[in-house]
Structure formats: structure tokens, C-alpha cells
Amino acid sequence: MLTLEKFEEASELVKRVTNPTKLIFSDYLSEQCGAKVYLKPENMQYTGAYKIRGAYYKISTLTQEERDRGLITASAGNHAQGVAFAAKKFGCRATIVMPTVTPLIKVNRTKSYGADVVLYGDVYDDAYNYACELAEKNGYTFVHPFNDLDVAAGQGTITMEIVQELPTVDYIVVPVGGGGLITGVATLAKMLNPKIKVIGVEPAEAASMTAALQAGEVVELDSANTIADGTAVKAVGDKIFPYVQENVDRMLLVEDDELIGAFLDMVENHKMIVENSGLLSVAALKQIDCKGKKVVCILSGGNMDVITMSSIVQHGLIQRDRIFSVSVLLPDKPGELVQVAKTIADEQGNVIKLEHNQFVSTNRNAAVELRITMEAFGT
């Protein structure tokens, strides 16, 4: 059972291993929303995400015999690092099962904390089922990433910090995957101040919590395909679900394209790297009528490899018409390319790639195809 005493105990314990992330006021988002928007940057946490909170508190509640058997968990990356880091602090062995699509940075960092990593399955649920098999076979103690009240209590320590720093907060906006984070955040928020509105945000293509709330019970999605890999969960936890039903005011959905835009905004306006799952709260702001209110958006993590970052930035620039390509046919004679370049320069465009093809088949004699990729101000 989640009690105020449990949250208070968890808050004291996690201070040993966490960075008390201070709220960051966002001028940019505040202007966009007409509200006072603050960011809770858990991407700046020691393991790059909030998950260390729940993992450390959960392991602290285990007996020495349970720890000595070795720990195992399944994770899309951030819980993996949390468990690996916490296990190292407690001096116990950890085995982590991760989906094969997990970003390399999360795999390598998990290994860097001394854990054994097993890659299995395409999504979290596949990895989870395999981890359960290994736990039963080898007698490991399973540390669930979200369907555990001790884990949820650890995650809820975020609320304690938010309310201590901003007692008059009106809204807390929370990324949602399996439901552990929002369970802890919402339950403690309602204990401390029932007037605080807690809003959960899911990827539209992995809306397992929304589906469960609509059905009145946990349901399993057929698929969970989203760039927000940390929240790609087919079914939420049944142990934490009643707390979500009771304490969460609203759920919102965000498309992948909106996450791409939010990533670009975060990089350009806040100079911060936040992974796609961690941006769900920010991407949903435009759906919330919060004018004149104080809003805290939890940025749940920032573990992202540079290849993924590069791809997201490129897609974001294309999405906003800041990078685009055109093809033109030109007479194959001197001076034509200069004229094209001058026209682009006059419109303040910047050529970043140029392909000149003299072998294109056209009905024009002596023509060449010019394919130009350029950068512009866009939208």
C-alpha cells in the first residue's frame, strides 16, 4: 500500500544516490502556453533518468537473502541503468534483459555499472517474459520496472521535490509507459494537495494506459510502435492501475511527429538533450488549457545515442521546412548552375548538398538534372 510514510521514507533514502534536480523555468514554453511552465529535468539525474529513484528504494526494501540471490529485471533502458547502478551500491549482482532495439548508449551504460546484459525481443514485453523465465530458472529476485508499489513510491519522490520547491504548483504533466512514474507522482500529489491536477501523456501508438482506463481494467495492445521506446509498453501494471484510476485527472496522447518537434525545441531553446519518451509532457502542453497556471513538465530521461539524435534533428528540420530538396532540369551549358545558386542565395537559402546528373533521360536535348538539398528559415 502506498502511504505518506512510505513516500517520506523513500525520499530520505533516495537522497543518497540521486541529484535533487531543480526546476527550470521555461520562458519559451511559458510564452507559448500563456502559463508559467517549469521543467523537472530528470534527464540530468546521475543515470540520465528518474528510474534510479524507484530501483534504489525497491532494492533497499529487499532482504539480504533476496539480494544475494542476484537481481534481474527487464527494461527498455532507463530502469536497467537504475537497477544496475543501485545493485552496485548494494554490492549485489544484476542481470538485465533489454529489447534488441534498445539504443546502444543505454546498453553500454548499463554494462558500465557492472550488470550482465541480455538482449531479447523487439519490445519491452518480450524482454519481460524472458526475464521472468530466467528468474524462475535461476532463482533471481525480480525488480519490476513499474508494476511494484515500492518502485512507484521511489518514483513519487519527484513530487516531494516539486512541491517543496513550488508549493503553489497547479499541474504536473507526466510521461506514461507502464505506469510506475505516474502512480507515484499522482498518488503523493493528491496526498500533499488534492487540488494539484496530474496529467499523464502517452505515445498515440502505445496508449496502453488510456486503453486500460477506457476499459476499466488492464488490457494488452496488439503493438506498441513509437519512437518513444522507453514508453513502448503493451500493457500497464495491474498492481499500480487502481492508483492511476483514483489519482490521475486526465490522459493525453501525442504523435511521434510532435515528439520530433519537441526535441528540436528543447535543443534550440533550452540547450538540453531529452529522449523522446521524456518529451511526452512537453509535447502535450498545447492540449492543456493552463493559461495563468503554474505547470511542471517532468522530463523523465535523456539517454539518447548520437545517431538517433541526428536522425531526429534531421526529421525535425524537414518537418518544419527548414531543410528540403528540389529537382530541376537545366540546359547543359556553362553558367546555368551559377544562375541557380544566385537565385537560392537571393532568397537567403543555403545549399547543403548538390547532385549533378548528366545521364538523366528526358525529352529535352542536352539537359541535365540538378537535385539540390538546401536549408531555409522554414516555419
Put a short name on every predicted segment:
Residues 1-379:
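PLP-dependent amino-acid enzyme catalytic core
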